[in-house]
Amino acid sequence: VIVTRNVTWNLPRPDLAYREWLRVLKPGGVLYNFDADWYGHLYNEEKRNSYEKDRHQTEEQQVEDYYRGTDIEKMEEIARQVPLSRLERPKWDLETMTKTGFLDVSCDEAVWKEVWTEEEIINNSTSPIFLLTGRKRAAFHLKNITVEPGQKWNGELELADGEIRLPATVLHGHAEGKTMLITAGVHAGEYVGIQAAIELSQKLKIEKVIGTIIIVKVMNRPAFEHRNGSMGLTDGRNLNREFPGNPDGTEMERLAWAVSQELQPVADFYIDLHSGDDYEKLTPYVYYAGAAPENVVKISREMAEQV
């Protein structure tokens, strides 16, 4: 948890404060920022009149005037040099927090009733303190992989207790959303799909990712590395015909089982890239699940139309 009070208003780049708070928070952590539109009266006539009303009110009720006890000219000079005195708050804060990547962003504009003394209320009744709250997205966990929000991971994804190691990229965006699984190399000789997955993993910008994207560049890795075409290296089986697989079966059966049990269940959407094998020439096309529940067929078709 990060708790701050009256920090942002006097910063030349208050947006950087929100960026740094998000950076240092642990995944799932929360920011509580107490602040107020302290010097909006310098640029708004209505707020100026309200500010003067507060000053008269402190005098009438014979309480200490917090502003009179400071160097007003110096403080206003400082306030004119920083951007938040001119911006509408907390609207600016809410928009900036959302843009930065905070989740569940909210503002409690009545918190002053709980935290201010009667004297503080008299002094600042027309510029009440508010409480801004935002949460950092939780990290993404999959087998041997942990990826924090806003991060991109490259390496080997381990399935079946490390027996299977697949080259993969995971992009875990700041903003929450769906999880997309993209695979290639089910047939190890279909190089176009594999190359497409590699290029996609390199070109995707983490700043634009909403949700999580998992890219497995080569599923049938042994056959790919030995240039053994599209069948299993040791069993000669077609991985694309072995799902859901068998944990005690042959090489391709075990791979199919690991993927169907450990990888596919984490995804909301799944795209499997294929192409012509090294001896084939194919016309580009996209097909989608037809023998499935109606809602799956509908969503799959919508995906296929966009691809």
Predicted features by range, described:
Residues V3:
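A conserved beta-strand element that flanks and buttresses the S-adenosyl-L-methionine
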Residues N6-V7:
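Short catalytic micro-motifs in class I SAM-dependent methyltransferases
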Residues D15-V30:
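A short glycine-rich, Lys/Arg-flanked "PGG" loop and its adjoining helix->strand segment in the class I
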Residues V30-T70:
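Conserved class I S-adenosyl-L-methionine
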Residues A36-H41, A110-W112, R221, G276:
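Short "lid" loop at the C-terminus of a central beta-strand within the Rossmann-like core
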Residues L84-D108:
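Short alpha-helix
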Residues T100-G101, T117-A138:
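Core SAM-dependent methyltransferase catalytic element
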Residues F140-V307:
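Structured catalytic-domain cores with a bias toward divalent-metal coordination
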